[in-house]
Amino acid sequence: MGTLQNGVSGWYARLDRCLDNREQQIDIWLSTWEKSLRSFQPIAALLPEDWPTLPANLLTDPGHVLDHLLARHDAESDGRSPRGAHPTPPRLADAVICSEMKDNLVNPKKPVQQSNFLMSNLPPGFRQHVEQLNLPKATQDNDVDDNAEREAVEQNKRTLSGIPLPVADTAAGGGLFHARLIRRHADAHQDADPELQKEDTRRLFSNIQLLDVDPLVVKSTKTRLLLESIRHELVSFGPETPGKISREEMEALLDAGVMQGDALQGEWPWTAAPELVLTNPPWLRIKDRFRGMEDGSQLRKELGERLRNLTDNGAPRFSTMRGNVNLYRLFIERSLQILKDGGRLRIIAPDSLLREQSSHPLRELLVKHHGWTHAWAIEEANLLFPGMTQGVVVLGITANGEAPALNLHGPITRSDLRKEGEGLSSRVPVFQLIEDRWTSWSRDTWAVPRLPRDRMERSHTLKVLDRLAELPRLSDEEHPLTTNQRQVRVRVGEIDQTAHAKNI
């Protein structure tokens, strides 16, 4: 259903039949995008004639087409089918970004206007009733200290537009998160002082950190961020102009802020630790890497050994590696190491992380050593990622912080995502998972339950979980099914019957 709604999946397949060189596809797309910006013509009118007709819903966001092409390139480089490649939806990226933004300081807050309506104009009965209500007078919101926030701007800890700095991506892909930040930054500076915008734009691009292992991705990301900035009138094609920095300066800032490297195995190339990491790393097991290569088996074995042997200050870099290691779990642990203390990680991952046994060490790390504050549960992910059957979770974690409870948001649907406020509709149910209750449910595995959206069903589910938590588990010695001091074992959802064959 998601693929039909998307309506564009066939365009990429037709493009592959027309031109099967992915690098050339990306190069032509980016150069045509630049021509479109220079000539103020639609990008579809400038594409080569032998390219398939561009669907209408791809005309408005050229960056999303680049994300698709890079996702297909990434899949093919590992020998996987490009049909299973799913770039991050811009709508989800916008919601995630929104949840971590600070107050906009570009335009000063307007004082709350007091009503000039006189109480004496009300009839006596109404006036007496209003006086009994004892309504408070409207006051200015003082939750945010503007002076402290402006000082943070001067120290390059944030932008006037509300973006925490430095802001990083440990698996940049096409730079989607930073491209959406550019859009948000430009919107915040709309109708603002041009010189203020220019100064804040320099501040932003002097404090971006994007890393990716693929040289084609790095090159494409630099071009994409340049074109996005030109599109949103933050950068000029030539020399510096009012409100816009020059292209030459922007390219120098991008060379310093977008680099090629391996975030998992290498060192973080920037000296300043990021304040915020926004990322959607590869959802790929090590055993699925290098499938299209002759010596893929040996390469996988060597990669696994290298990752297990990596150390920092004598301690393993990845302390939670278990079973069939999935790369997104390593990116979570590595991103938390890179962040400054108190920095925030927002990462998109499969929702199996919340419950699978092999992720138990990682969940324990997040609870015991960091502040795991949020989990957005998106169960109907096929409406966001066309063709995907797996659920998605967006984690919110404070590096080396503490969290009194995990705020579990969901189930979330596509229509719940927002570009303002906290990124989610107020209709989305929120459940605070307190540590004591969490422990009694999961017996220290820190598994997160899947809760229904309906209020009555949710209440019933919580009561059932509380009741089940008091009963012995199948693997407990005191369970009634334990015979001859041998507990029932569960494998992949089925009871192991070998120990009880005589009694069946």
Q: Language model features by range: what are they?
A:
Residues 208:
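Short beta-strand element of Class I
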Residues 1, 87-92, 147, 172-175, ...:
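Signature of N6-adenine DNA methyltransferases within the class I
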Residues 162-164, 205, 273-274, 342:
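A general structural motif
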Residues 202, 252, 388-389:
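A short, structural micro-pattern
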Residues 110-121, 235-248:
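Short, glycine/acidic-rich hinge or "gate" loops at secondary-structure transitions
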Residues 221:
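Conserved SAM-binding loop
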Residues 256-261:
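Conserved SAM-binding strand-loop segment of SAM-dependent methyltransferases
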Residues 1-203, 211-217, 262, 267, ...:
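Class I S-adenosyl-L-methionine
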